[in-house]
């Protein structure tokens, strides 16, 4: 085993998350900004290389903090990244990943179905203009970006980083007499991290729609929270990679559904 296992854990997970962040450079930011409704005469800022650098730098800093926090706390609270752990200990990684495939696929199917259901309900409450903008927004996100940023980076931020931290904080504040976090601790942490995951999608939704409507809040919060619950459960019971697999599969489901006209 490496003399510095935590450093290896950090590097492995940070590099994976950074790949997801860099995949965001595949997005046409100028076309994306042009989708936002603005008052007539408003000058749309030019997307310069500096702006693109900031678009990468800010999430990279957050990623570093999340990965570091997870590395320091995950094992203490009984959470893990089995695939990354196998790489650290130089053991065969495939068996660790194989055990997470089925839970990840099932979770992705459930999460995708939930988002499609909430999308169908919300669609009846949205104007044709908003639906068109949501559709165009989806078309501007390449599949590699959806898979790598959504699947890798967001799971490292929200599950490995935030959820792990919440489990540890709740445990240390309210259950100090317990030798390990209880089921209630994990459930509360999953709920809170799912809500944060959902709320984190609201700003871009508001910018895209141009107003804060009940239908948008309903769809964004409930759809993303539903998947957050699935991903949180998978991380708790099977490991981080199962949540990553589920997240990636959800994006595949949504792309297929969108191309078939069954989603935005």
Regions found by a protein language model. Name each.
Residues 1-16, 55-60, 92-109, 241-244:
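Alpha-helical transmembrane segments and their helix-start/interface "positive-inside/aromatic belt" motifs
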Residues 16-35, 67-75, 115-120:
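Alpha-helical transmembrane segments of multi-pass membrane proteins
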Residues 30-46, 126-138, 212, 217:
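Membrane-interfacial helical/loop segments at transmembrane boundaries in membrane proteins
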Residues 41-58, 137-147:
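Membrane-interface segments at the starts/ends of alpha-helical transmembrane spans
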Residues 51-63, 216-223:
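Alpha-helical transmembrane segments of polytopic membrane proteins
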Residues 66-82, 161-168:
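Membrane-water interface of transmembrane alpha-helices
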Residues 78-153, 168-177:
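Juxtamembrane helix-loop-helix connectors linking adjacent transmembrane helices
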Residues 140-264:
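Transmembrane helix-loop-helix hairpins at the membrane interface
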């Amino acid at each position: 085993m490496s003399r510095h296992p935590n450093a290896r854990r950090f590097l492995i997970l940070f590099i994976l998350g950074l790949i997801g962040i860099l995949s965001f450079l595949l997005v046409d930011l100028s076309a994306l900004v042009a989708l936002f409704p603005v008052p007539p005469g408003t000058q749309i800022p030019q997307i310069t290389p500096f702006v693109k650098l900031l678009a990468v730098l800010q999430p990279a800093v957050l990623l570093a903090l999340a990965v570091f926090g997870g590395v320091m706390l995950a094992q203490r609270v009984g959470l893990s990244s089995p695939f990354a752990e196998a790489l650290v200990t130089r053991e065969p990684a495939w068996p660790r990943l194989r055990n997470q495939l089925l839970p990840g696929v099932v979770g992705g199917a459930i999460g995708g179905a939930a988002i499609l259901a909430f999308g169908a309900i919300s669609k009846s409450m949205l104007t044709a203009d908003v639906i068109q903008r949501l559709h165009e927004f989806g078309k501007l996100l390449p599949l590699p970006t959806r898979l790598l940023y959504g699947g890798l980076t967001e799971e490292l931020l929200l599950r490995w980083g935030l959820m792990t931290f919440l489990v540890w904080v709740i445990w240390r504040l309210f259950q100090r007499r317990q030798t390990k976090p209880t089921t209630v601790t994990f459930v509360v942490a999953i709920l809170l991290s799912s809500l944060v995951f959902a709320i984190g999608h609201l700003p871009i939704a508001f910018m895209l729609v141009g107003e804060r409507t009940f239908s948008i809040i309903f769809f964004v919060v409930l759809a993303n929270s539903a998947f957050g619950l699935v991903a949180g459960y998978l991380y708790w019971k099977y490991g981080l990679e199962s949540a990553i697999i589920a997240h990636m599969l959800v994006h595949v489901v949504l792309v297929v559904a969108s191309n078939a006209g069954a989603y935005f």
